[in-house]
Structures are given as C-alpha cells and as structure tokens.
Amino acid sequence: MSTAVQVDDVMRYRDSRFQTIAAKLLPTQYLVVDDDTALTTTLGSCVAACLRDPVLKIGGMNHFLLPEGQIGDGAPARYGSYAMELLINDMLKRGAHRKRIEAKVFGGANVLKGFTSNPVGTRNAEFVRQYLQAEHIPIIAEDLCGIHPRKVWFFATTGRVAVQRLPHAHEAEVAATESAVRARLSKAPVTGGVELFE
C-alpha cells in the first residue's frame, strides 16, 4: 500500500517498482531534486525534458503541453518556452553550471485525434530539440513522437531513465487528460514570471 503526500503541488508516493520515493509531475509542473527521488510523469502529446548536471548530481523534469503561446495567455507553464526557463533557472539557482547541463527528452506522441496536418506532439518534439540546441544543451537520449503514450521515470542523481510505452488502451485516457488540462488552462488567469540568468 502506498501513501501519497502533496508537497509544492507535486504529489509524492512510494514507488514499489523502483523501491523509492517518486514525485509525479502533471502538465505544467516541474521539479528539481538532488536526492534519490524518482521524477515521473505520463505523456501523450506533451513533452518532458529531463535536465541534469552530472557533476553536482542535480536534475529536474518538466511537463509541458504546447511549444509556445500568446503573450498574456494564462498559465504560462503549459508552454515549453516558459517551462524550460523555469527548469533551467531553478537548476542554476541551486548551483548547476549551464555548460554541464545535459538533456533527455520524451513524449510528443500523436495521440490527439483531429490534429493530422500539424500534430501537437510533433510540434512539441520539434520545439524541445530546437530550444535545447539554441541553448547549447546536448540531448544525450530521446524517445519522441510515434503513436504511443509513455510513462517516464527519471533519477536525477544517476541520470538513469526508464520509459514504458503504454498500450493503445491508454491513448484515450491520456488524450482526454491532456485535453481537459488544456481546456482548464485556457480559462486560467495570467500568473508568474521568469527570472533570467546568464
């Protein structure tokens, strides 16, 4: 039996598969850790970037819904550009060195029906690759695009990642969750800000 605890809006629980504490990230969330906590999330068309400074053994994960949004749009953390800045800046505040940061990226599946000409998943995957290239952060592993949702576990201290591709039976559930979050966030008030570091 596992007991879930909510800290900093991120739910933590005992993961029996890996015998460790896990922090489950939902869309728009990110978390940076320097311990054995497994960062985990479930992705459809969304993307998660797992960043790590291998010298400090500090790392973090984000989970974003869309590449970019309109200025003044509510809930900016749903957008990759903002979510990436939040994650990178938090790591830098904790002592990570920008030149040592490496990335592993996941998600971007095309699970949303009706988006065939310019699928959200493909746009998210293209965005994260371009963003990290522009920031000179190397991608050392990726599992992007395709048609299957994924569950991802990231262990920041070791850099290890486990990815489970979910069967088609989960597609509708993941797509419905992402659509519901998008609908809720489209009504959210504008909040937050980004502090940029050089």
Curated annotation (Swiss-Prot):
Its EC number is 3.5.1.44. Keywords: Chemotaxis, Hydrolase. It catalyses: L-glutaminyl-[protein] + H2O = L-glutamyl-[protein] + NH4(+). This is Probable chemoreceptor glutamine deamidase CheD. The keyword Cell division does not apply. GO terms for biological process: chemotaxis. CDD domains: CheD (cd16352). Disulfide bonds: none annotated. The keyword Disulfide bond does not apply. One of its GO terms (molecular function) is protein-glutamine glutaminase activity. Probably deamidates glutamine residues to glutamate on methyl-accepting chemotaxis receptors (MCPs), playing an important role in chemotaxis. It holds the Pfam family CheD. It comes from the Bacteria. Belongs to the CheD family. InterPro entries: CheD-like_sf (IPR038592), Chemorcpt_Glu_NH3ase_CheD (IPR005659), Cytotoxic_necrot_fac-like_cat (IPR011324).
